[in-house]
């Protein structure tokens, strides 16, 4: 290995062809790029990348292969005023690497310098990129391609979901392998979900601040290598990629889609005081949004913001998404703080990355879900994403919680959210599935905590309970905490059932947080991003089987109601929906404006939801016909025909007309 051939500019990253490895790196402002390879003893050998095509630096190294450890040193101007922070003393991770060896330590040698370059060499402590052979036997794999109208999403953390499941072999608990194990697949199938949405599995790092407190980043929203499977979730770190692909293949065989939470908005380099380990040293001005004072626009709250309007960065991001679809066969993405993807810097529906996805024949066909906000100016964009995207709907979450737990939202607002928030999404040709309905998610209270806590309890996060939202719209039903008397426990159970029924029988795409169906609590912590412990791990031995069965019955019931699966907007008089009062009469204009009270929702003519959000028992006259309560509100062979429902406080029931 004495010199490199010219190689080719695509694809980005390190590509093994059986005879050698092609290296390609985007940097618009670099003046020279050195490829640094390391032997088993850590000895470094450097090669200049000999060719440049546009802004792609590239070269081909003969006789190199899988397992080769490498990094880059990138030469260019040190000119913070112009956004340039090149520093060849810093060994840099390939942003398209398919494996990264080593964690990101809290070590000053990784710092690139604030206003003057830090000349200390970082190679001894910097994580190393590694060449990977991407070949895999996908024979027999068939993506489920579940229609949006039939999709039920289950949001889960690989480790938190599986670590304490006694049905799994101990050696694979907490790993990718566990996801594809027959015991987990049987659980998913019995529950009825159609898509498993995983919190980030691309390699991430723990912030230095957390490391100093003895904590770690648990959720994974601090990306270090966007194209690399995080080895911490592998039973064998050397096989992380294949273990993940094995799980995807097994899930597909069971008809379950896999959606990845992807963090295309910031990097683990944090702010100017953070480490220089990749993008900052490769081309700071291109990869990040840089302010006139040379600091970063912090529209993510994480110290920096990716500039996904730059053509080179757009292509890098597109190739990242294609890697996950082409090489890992994932079925879609949930984009964290997705407004960043549309910034130019103002948000636009035709932003470069959105257009690149729309034009891509593969990416335009997978499921795309946006978290439609960031913390920058104009960052809240619910309902404004391009038609290809579904969006998390916080209006639904807040309205459902306020209806059942606060009793301070009108029937009209609740009905609007129940009917797929047509005021937000019935435009640009979007279907009702464009709203991803949720009552809880990984951030915020769990379902159980929504009915047990009025206040957040985040002291364990080390920020004196300042972190996490204060707008929880929760209700502890008179006693703060999990312990309560029988009467309070019953009220909590009724409220949890009502919220689950609202979520799973509303129009739109429902998303269930893993553990909500088991009664999992985080003891009031509504921002458990740094709690890799029993607070966040699902305790399967303590799961509530009655609540699990209730949830599963609702999901299976959902699939029987055409108004919920056809994915068409409800229109006046089309037979899909009727909104009725407690006397089975159409709601009046005055009743629509009432705060939380009683209503009946008739779906597809034969199905009826009765809702009593008051604190009193209410008799509700059912519409004309013979109505029987159905599971999970009655047994399979329920013979009781009702004309009046004696609705308990905070109660809900579903009926079918004979």
From Swiss-Prot:
Removes maltotriose and maltotetraose chains that are attached by 1,6-alpha-linkage to the limit dextrin main chain, generating a debranched limit dextrin. Pathway: Glycan degradation; glycogen degradation. InterPro entries: GlgX_C (IPR040784), GlgX_Isoamylase_N_E_set (IPR044505), Glyco_hydro_13_cat_dom (IPR006047), Glyco_hydro_13_N (IPR004193), Glyco_hydro_b (IPR013780), Glycogen_debranch_bac (IPR022844), Glycogen_debranch_GlgX (IPR011837), Glycoside_hydrolase_SF (IPR017853). Pfam families: Alpha-amylase (PF00128), CBM_48 (PF02922), GlgX_C (PF18390). The lineage of its organism: Bacteria, Pseudomonadati, Pseudomonadota, Gammaproteobacteria, Enterobacterales. The record marks 443 as: Transition state stabilizer. The keyword Hydrolase applies. Keywords: Carbohydrate metabolism, Glycogen metabolism, Glycosidase, Hydrolase. The active site is at residues 336, 371. It catalyses: Hydrolysis of (1->6)-alpha-D-glucosidic linkages to branches with degrees of polymerization of three or four glucose residues in limit dextrin. The keyword Hydrolase applies. NCBIfam families: glgX_debranch (TIGR02100), PRK03705.1 (NF002983). One of its GO terms (molecular function) is glycogen debranching enzyme activity. GO terms for biological process: glycogen catabolic process. Belongs to the glycosyl hydrolase 13 family. It comes from Klebsiella pneumoniae subsp. pneumoniae (strain ATCC 700721 / MGH 78578). It is an enzyme of class 3 (hydrolase). This is Glycogen debranching enzyme. CDD domains: AmyAc_Glg_debranch, E_set_GDE_Isoamylase_N. It comes from the Bacteria. Its EC number is 3.2.1.196.
